């Protein structure tokens, strides 16, 4: 059988029973805690924040600082003193994340628009502790102000809100006008100036409810490939670019068209399969010792829009914690989880198919410059005591952003090492430094029309501003920047080379030992026979090649070979 493909073989169904996740304890298999205990209470920490007064308004707890000790002592200027044998200080980026008050103000502004000139939103209001009074309810006309100025006379004068049935001629004329305006809007969008971070609007292109307008399926016939509108990339910091890029990605994904029409649909399926395999093989529950939480928990750093939520259900976790720098991505992840969680309700205590059976919480933050408690505790008081240490920390397609500086990498590894239990795993995917070196040594990197050095194909490319070293070994190991482009996914975003031996050496400083490292092609070829019958049918069909076999081919194969998977285990 060729190494770059897979043909499924018929096997006894009983051979795949071991694919069901079981929790290991001293080498013996056990069933899920939820299978054994039917009256178990939810692992969510949401119940702990339903108080009349927000967490940041309550009196300080004399033991509060103890929960931060394991992540390093804090000093007056806001920097963190790293532990675990590292004597460096990592500055906290003041503008890298959304503060608690800013998030509360944003939430209040969206949810509490009462009049044409509303008062400033209160910074003491949170989604979990919002209070209402009779005077705070908006009038019937002001309810529509948040959708824009529909008419001078309120809802009664807006022809779009009429419930009177229009005749066929009027309807066809209305549809014709809408199509004409849509074309003009697309032209204007392409020629408009890019917006800054503060101008990104998460509510663009929402249709006002109008039963008189028939929504045709013309949009499904055309797929709009993602393009970002980030200006002045050369002079902006990496955090600002990454945040705006993924905010725009979240916005545009809702109006691109059917996902199956994406030019990288098969490539995405391949990458998702790799992540299923990694989490399925390496994210394991272990019986808790002492006061550690007796739940199977995963910390997902740089969680994005929650693309790995299905994978966490696949391995049957109990608690999910997601952190990302993009506030719109975090909002989308929470929305995705909430909708799926509410689809089916189970009162038996057993896991239910087609729904998320785990509890989850999400937060906006930069895990490269802030500690995990600083990100989570303001919104989820007590979570560090209740849900940590975790069984696995996952960071997918994001760690390379930290290699801008050594300080950022060390800050990330402090968060990982301090969040993991002993025996827990650090699971991730990064660009392969070996792949980049091979492109350089084999002279497959060319100078483009702008004098920059580039390799890739029609699906992906990596562009260096200056000529890389002839031997492909970057010195020093940090700050080696290139611009990465992946069609319909990553639109010329700065990334940094991750010399793997440097990552390995740093992880060993934080008591994490390498257990697994393979490029994506090898992971797929070696593991897919075990997982083929377990994965979702549509995901598997998305892996089918033009010759009927399964795997990556052509330019897709080169694009996925750009990445490598790794697993580190915390030993002490």
Swiss-Prot record:
EC number: 2.1.1.56
Family in the record: Belongs to the class I-like SAM-binding methyltransferase superfamily. mRNA cap 0 methyltransferase family.
Compositionally skewed regions (Basic and acidic residues) per UniProt: 24-39, 59-69
mRNA cap 0 methyltransferase domain ranges (all copies): 262-571
Gene Ontology MF terms in the entry: mRNA 5'-cap (guanine-N7-)-methyltransferase activity; RNA binding
Bias (Low complexity) ranges: 123-140
Positions with a binding annotation for mRNA: 271-272
Top enzyme category: transferase
Name assigned to this protein: mRNA cap guanine-N(7) methyltransferase
Positions of region (Disordered): 1-75, 110-140
Its biological purpose: Responsible for methylating the 5'-cap structure of mRNAs.
Catalyses which reaction(s): a 5'-end (5'-triphosphoguanosine)-ribonucleoside in mRNA + S-adenosyl-L-methionine = a 5'-end (N(7)-methyl 5'-triphosphoguanosine)-ribonucleoside in mRNA + S-adenosyl-L-homocysteine
Keyword Transcription regulation part of the UniProt annotation: no
